[in-house]
Amino acid sequence: MKKASLESKEAKTKELAELARSHGTKVLYMQAGDTVRSKRAAMRCLYPKASDKAEDVNDLCLVLQFEEGDISALFGGDISTDVEEQLLRRRKWDKVLVFKADHHGSRYANAEALLKCIRPEITVASAGKDNRYGHPSPDAVQRIKESGSRFFCTIEGGRIRVRVIENKLVCETYVK
């Protein structure tokens, strides 16, 4: 059983943090309840709490919610449906305009219950072509589309950018 902690004990993670610091980048460690704010926007950490535990280290990655005015986006990292269910029990949810599909669109994430609750207009999955895991899963993509969300994946679209133009959500893809 692995426990969430603010600072990773993984050598590669420590090395990456030191490299970032050496280039003048401020490294932040977040847990549920922490918020980073700018003048117009906020990024809130929803999960994990420092006391959370999980068998799979993926279930301890950050879940973040971005908000700017009426725009909200949910970034669930590599969490599974187990963590999605915890999040549904822990808080009241409002509609999320943009959802970064959990675990690259894995069949073990992006549960129907979560999608019904957050009702995303746009869902984006990040996955490499011909990846060994088969992400995004056809089952997950079907659940996402059946929820009424428009679905975009980096496999087809390359880099994906979501913006608000004249009060409308616009998703742009770039393939070289």
Over which residues does each language-model region extend?
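Non-globular, low-confidence helical/coil segments that flank catalytic cores
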Residues: 1-176
